[in-house]
Amino acid sequence: MPRRGPVAKRDVLPDPIYNSKLVTRLINKIMIDGKKSKAQKILYTAFDIIRERTGKDPMEVFEQALKNVMPVLEVRARRVGGANYQVPVEVRPDRRVSLGLRWLVQYARLRNEKTMEERLANEIMDAANNTGAAVKKREDTHKMAEANRAFAHYRW
């Protein structure tokens, strides 16, 4: 915790094409080594692929995918009398979005398609259909929380 009071939350500007702060945050998650224009090109091409394959608005597909990936519960380690317990806690709204975006990009990178654009597009489409690795990650997180429900009274 900082000694000088709470840290001010930085706000991102909405992206120029879709006018969405979520899209800007996703671009920032995709970005490696500060190459933002490359990250933008990857995302916009992925959105074009989504539009082409589904015939729907890519923003709607992306928002549905994000909704399906965002976790409601997670476990946090809590030390009680020399033992570490995995205590299930609710995820804060801003952290839910951050985790959802992070998992989408992380599991898109692990896919086997040739280009990052294809990987990202397919991961977003899979997530929108409630399949894919990012959705599995959310399910695993929820399963962990459910398995450790007995320790819920240690919440802080």
Curated annotation (Swiss-Prot):
Alphabetized, the UniProt keywords read:
Ribonucleoprotein, Ribosomal protein, RNA-binding, rRNA-binding, tRNA-binding
One GO term under biological process is: translation
Asked if the record carries the keyword Ribosomal protein, the reply is: yes
Q: Which PROSITE patterns match?
A: RIBOSOMAL_S7 (PS00052)
GO CC terms of this entry: small ribosomal subunit
Taxonomically, which superkingdom? Bacteria
Record keyword rRNA-binding present: yes
Looking up InterPro entries in the UniProt record yields: Ribosomal_uS7, Ribosomal_uS7_bac/org-type, Ribosomal_uS7_CS, Ribosomal_uS7_dom, Ribosomal_uS7_dom_sf
MF (Gene Ontology): rRNA binding; structural constituent of ribosome; tRNA binding
A Pfam family cross-referenced in the UniProt record is Ribosomal_S7
Q: How does it assemble?
A: Part of the 30S ribosomal subunit. Contacts proteins S9 and S11.
**Into which family does the record put it?**
Belongs to the universal ribosomal protein uS7 family.
Described function: One of the primary rRNA binding proteins, it binds directly to 16S rRNA where it nucleates assembly of the head domain of the 30S subunit. Is located at the subunit interface close to the decoding center, probably blocks exit of the E-site tRNA.
What's the name of the protein?
A: Small ribosomal subunit protein uS7
Q: State the gene name recorded for this protein.
A: rpsG
